Amino acid sequence: MDKNTLQLSIGFYENELCRNILPFWLDRCEDKVNGGYFNCFTNDGSRLVSTDKYTWSEGRFLWLFSKMAQMPKPFTDAERKEFLRLAKSGRDFLVKNCFIRDDRPLRCVFLMDETGAPKTVEGFENEGYDMSIYADGFVHDGLSQYSIAADNKESYEIAKELYLSIMHRFETYNYRTLPYPISPEYVMHGFYMMRINYSYNIYLASQKFDPQFAEYAFTKLRESVDNLLNLFTDEGGVLREVIYRGGGRVPGIFGNHSNPGHVCEEMWFVLHAADLLGDPSYTEKCIKCLKKALELGWDPVYGGLYHFVDSDKGGEPLPGDNDPVDEPIYKQLMSGWSDKLWWVHSEALYATLLFGERANDKELLDWYDKIFDYTFKVHPNPDREIREWVQILQRDNTPVTKVTALPVKDPFHITRNLMYILRFLYTLEK
């Protein structure tokens, strides 16, 4: 990237983060009465439709504000101080309200009302409050990052306890995965992916507070990367979403579909981990998987990346004779495969830029330009009073009101990727 393009890119992304995305959330998300954050907005951001609080999103907010509080650029000292205050609001709300402490390992409530009182999920009223190990993981990540930002060892100790609980439950298959429930004979790529993130975050925090535990987290980080790449990818670079619990490919489209956004996200997870591990050997396989996901996932008619695709030929996943049609993931796959989602394109932007520049890979840099043009044509909200992205589009890029995971408008992927894009671009200035 030449100097002029670099400076233009930095200016563009600073504007997108600081003048378009963050103002929406800074004006709307804080619950000044109870603590924590609101984010149950409509897809276009025009209305707050519920004051419920999903622990999944509360933990993500905590991570974002904690991370931004540590960024020297593009924020001022006053802004970083405000981010840390907002992070503390979420941290205190979660620590006060979200944990389930009994004779089992530490777990988190999945859903709370605005005061922090636990709520059951519609359709799962008799199944308790701890409905998703993913939600536990986002709380863990938020507390890990907050412990670093605020130099708060108590938050680290809670994050460590939660990390050990998550890993134990994963290894004993004792967990649930709302909003992506799946039968016990299957395992989803998503949790193996998130294990990398959990191990990465607790490693960073333990380096500050607990060097002995950092050695354990370092080992788990490498193990998580190897398991993910060995179990879910093939020699052609295809990364499938679902396998059998004991390993092995699931027949039919249920085992033969991919999520291009997950692959983009996963590959930069692995690269970040590889940097920390000091092991560049993962890069070649990551690039192969990334290129394959982009090839399979791109819509040649309307542009953009599909939500789900056939892992062999790309495009529409076609049903087979023996597909598990009652699996919720299968239903989501078949009904929403062609959706164009905000988070998919933000992940693709960062992944293609990062790998393209670091590997000097023209094909990936061309993909970055293509994804950039598409993303900033269709996702930014044309209503300048809102500006935050329209998050869910139909195949033809028209907005649609629907729920893809939780009934929330989530700032996490856009904000995190804009932060990471800027952080990377700043390194190119040096």
Give the role of each language-model region.
Residues 1-430:
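Glycan-recognition and catalytic cores of secretory/periplasmic carbohydrate-active enzymes
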